């Protein structure tokens, strides 16, 4: 793209590359008139239109203009040419808070307390303006030259006007490890409550050096999030533990509010000095945990060693193998299986099973159960590339909420997609809450 030293719009001299993502790059730049250092986010117009990001960009601009707070990265101006869109933003010199955690392994409660107070101040301000961030995580928290926190990246933010008539937001946004259980359920959620949950996960990560909710795969992590299953390590002060359990309450209606957080003893007074331990050198286990916080993924099959949901009649699940696109984390996780599909259902296990059996019969598919409890479904005739075959697993998040995952294991991919789109998806519409990957 633009090389170092290039003059942009006769106003900015472009410098080094600060970072890049799927849809753009961020460069350091200098205002030629004021000599002020800025960061310029550059996006290709055609690519934005092609992938349907125009609404998200409009929202980001609107949001950033609504918020002006010392702990929020400021948007100075937006410029455009025929081919490019340029966001001129405050340049934050200190880098990501995320990098600090990765380098040290964890922070003391005293340091984490300072950052958490600044985070809550910024989030509370946003909420007072009807703005919800929806993607709060350490990577979106920057530090200035004075070690003060700055919240960035409003690309997923939602305005209060985006709510439906029920007063709730309905878009699944955010990064899996930091997302609230009600967001996962995709049944509508209060943006303020979901941001509070994410703040709690961030606080835990800062002091622990690892994520509160972990599992061998995404489904198990989601299950733990839904049930609020986490434990605080021994070096957490008692008051911090008490606050975290109130913040990461899986029930949004009883979850602590920002006002109550600000009134809590730990938030107002900080940790007890005699409870604070010195930061330790990263050991092998902590390094592994930090890798999880950083989002480093194992190359191993994401479903390896998963204990399947114990449903009486797993045969029913075989029929699910024909769906496409339900990935609750479709925005964030790169799928390791090309022909994998997931969907959610709010029906009971018995209803799902019955429906799957009906669909299998209608589509002339053979259903059989494997020894490890995974259901295998296959065609009765050999296709262009052998017999079409699928593995199916059902994961119980709650008794009335299930995630069904399907994976093609053999046969022709084109035949699989055709069967999925023309046969399976239409046949399962009565039990599907959402195909993940669909808008």
Swiss-Prot record:
Residues 338-367 are annotated as: PPI. Its cofactor is Mn(2+). The keyword Signal does not apply. The keyword Cell cycle does not apply. The active site is at residue 135. InterPro entries: KA1/Ssp2_C, Kinase-like_dom_sf, NAF/FISL_domain, NAF_dom, Prot_kinase_dom, Protein_kinase_ATP_BS, Ser/Thr_kinase_AS. GO terms for biological process: signal transduction. GO terms for molecular function: ATP binding; protein serine kinase activity; protein serine/threonine kinase activity. Pfam families: NAF (PF03822), Pkinase (PF00069). Its EC number is 2.7.11.1. ATP binds at residues 18-26, 41. Residues 153-182 are annotated as: Activation loop. Residues 12-267 form the Protein kinase domain. Keywords: ATP-binding, Kinase, Manganese, Nucleotide-binding, Serine/threonine-protein kinase, Transferase. The activation loop within the kinase domain is the target of phosphorylation/activation by upstream protein kinases. The PPI motif mediates the interaction with the ABI (abscisic acid-insensitive) phosphatases. CIPK serine-threonine protein kinases interact with CBL proteins. Binding of a CBL protein to the regulatory NAF domain of CIPK protein lead to the activation of the kinase in a calcium-dependent manner. This is CBL-interacting protein kinase 14. It comes from Oryza sativa subsp. japonica (Rice).
């Amino acid at each position: 793209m633009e090389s170092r030293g290039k003059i942009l719009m006769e106003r900015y001299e472009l410098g080094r590359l600060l970072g890049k993502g799927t849809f753009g790059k961020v460069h350091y730049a200098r205002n030629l008139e004021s000599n002020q250092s800025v960061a310029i986010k550059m996006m290709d117009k055609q690519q934005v239109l092609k992938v349907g990001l125009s609404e998200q960009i409009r929202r980001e601009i609107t949001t950033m203009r609504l918020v002006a707070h010392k702990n929020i990265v400021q948007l100075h101006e937006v410029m455009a040419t025929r081919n490019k869109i340029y966001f001129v933003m405050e340049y934050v010199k200190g880098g990501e808070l995320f990098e600090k955690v990765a380098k040290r392994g964890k922070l003391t409660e005293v340091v984490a307390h300072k950052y958490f107070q600044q985070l809550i101040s910024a989030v509370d301000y946003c909420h007072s303006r009807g703005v919800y961030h929806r993607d709060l995580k350490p990577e979106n928290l920057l530090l200035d030259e004075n070690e003060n926190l700055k919240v960035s990246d409003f690309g997923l933010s939602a305005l209060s006007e985006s709510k439906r008539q029920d007063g709730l937001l309905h878009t699944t946004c955010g990064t899996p490890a930091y997302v609230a259980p009600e967001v996962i359920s995709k049944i509508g959620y209060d943006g303020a409550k979901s941001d509070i949950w994410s703040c709690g996960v961030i606080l835990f990560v800062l002091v622990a050096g690892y994520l509160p909710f972990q599992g061998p795969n995404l489904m198990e992590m989601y299950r733990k999030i839904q049930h609020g299953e986490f434990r605080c390590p021994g070096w957490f002060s008692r008051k911090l533990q008490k606050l975290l359990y109130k913040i990461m309450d899986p029930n949004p209606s009883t979850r602590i509010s920002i006002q109550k957080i600000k009134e809590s003893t730990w938030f107002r007074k900080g940790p007890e000095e005699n409870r604070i331990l010195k930061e330790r050198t990263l050991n092998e286990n902590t390094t592994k945990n930090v890798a999880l916080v950083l989002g480093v993924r194992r190359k191993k099959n994401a479903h390896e060693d998963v204990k399947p949901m114990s449903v009486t009649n797993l045969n029913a699940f075989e029929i699910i193998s024909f769906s496409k696109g339900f990935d609750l984390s479709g925005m964030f996780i790169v799928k390791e299986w090309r022909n994998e599909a997931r969907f959610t259902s709010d029906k009971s296990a018995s209803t799902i099973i019955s429906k799957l059996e009906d669909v299998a019969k209608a589509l002339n598919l053979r259903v059989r159960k494997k020894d490890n409890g995974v259901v295998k479904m296959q065609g009765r005739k050999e296709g262009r590339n052998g017999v079409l075959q699928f593995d199916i697993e059902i994961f119980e998040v709650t008794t009335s909420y299930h995630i069904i995952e399907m994976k093609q294991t053999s046969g022709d991919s084109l035949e699989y997609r055709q069967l999925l789109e023309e046969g399976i998806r239409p046949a399962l519409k009565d039990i599907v809450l959402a195909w993940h990957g669909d808008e």
